[in-house]
């Protein structure tokens, strides 16, 4: 993955970084019975291939500690326990989420993940009921989990204890 921000300002350096990301996922099935249990797990590794002094900050690698050079690597791992009963599935742990309210996205070298719970139900043909709550996220260019933040509107760089959502989607 290569990112080049040509800033075109005499007072700022360009940010250019090149990296390679590796993502391994394990998704088990469910145990037999009315209530089934399973486990999803992942491991991620991001390697810096290029990003010399003063060129960090493109958003694909972790931000430097002030020297203009991103770390040579970063990694993370996580898991989520899942429980299924009839047409309802509950997941708790580290989640890959994509819905209209919260979406980690895969627009950078490694995807963003969230820590919390999600609940989905597919009892009605064509309809999906979904809800959940998350308290932490792992940004796509970091190793550890952080409290949720937002930079939208007048909120600045505020943190929150959690984000809760619920919704219904239909596919015909």
Q: PLM features: residue spans?
A:
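Beta-barrel outer-membrane channel/assembly domains of diderm bacteria
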Residues: 1-97, 121-123
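Flexible, active-site-adjacent loop/turn segments at secondary-structure boundaries
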Residues: 5, 100, 112
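Extracellular loop and loop/strand-boundary signature of outer-membrane beta-barrel proteins
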Residues: 9-12, 64-67, 102-105, 147-154
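Extended aliphatic helical segments
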Residues: 34-35, 63, 101, 117, ...
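Outer-membrane beta-barrel and related beta-rich outer-membrane complex signature
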Residues: 49-55, 104, 141-145
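Signature for the C-terminal beta-barrel architecture of outer-membrane proteins
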Residues: 86, 108-172
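"Short basic amphipathic alpha-helical interaction patches in structured regions
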Residues: 95, 104-109
């Amino acid at each position: 993955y290569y990112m080049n921000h040509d800033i075109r300002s005499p007072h700022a350096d360009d940010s250019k970084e090149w990296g390679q990301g590796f993502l391994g996922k394990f998704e088990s099935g469910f145990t037999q019975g009315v209530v089934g249990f399973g486990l999803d797990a992942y491991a991620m590794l991001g390697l810096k291939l290029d990003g010399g002094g003063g060129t960090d900050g493109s958003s694909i690698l972790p931000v430097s500690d002030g020297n203009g050079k991103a770390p040579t690597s970063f990694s993370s791992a996580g898991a989520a326990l899942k429980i299924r009963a009839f047409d309802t599935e509950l997941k708790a742990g580290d989640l890959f989420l994509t819905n209209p309210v919260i979406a980690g996205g895969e627009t950078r070298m490694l995807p963003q993940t969230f820590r919390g719970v999600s609940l989905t139900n597919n009892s009605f043909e064509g309809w999906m009921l979904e809800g959940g709550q998350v308290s932490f996220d792992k940004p796509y260019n970091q190793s550890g989990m952080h409290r949720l933040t937002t930079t939208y509107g007048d909120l600045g760089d505020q943190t929150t204890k959690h984000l809760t959502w619920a919704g219904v989607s239909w596919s015909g």
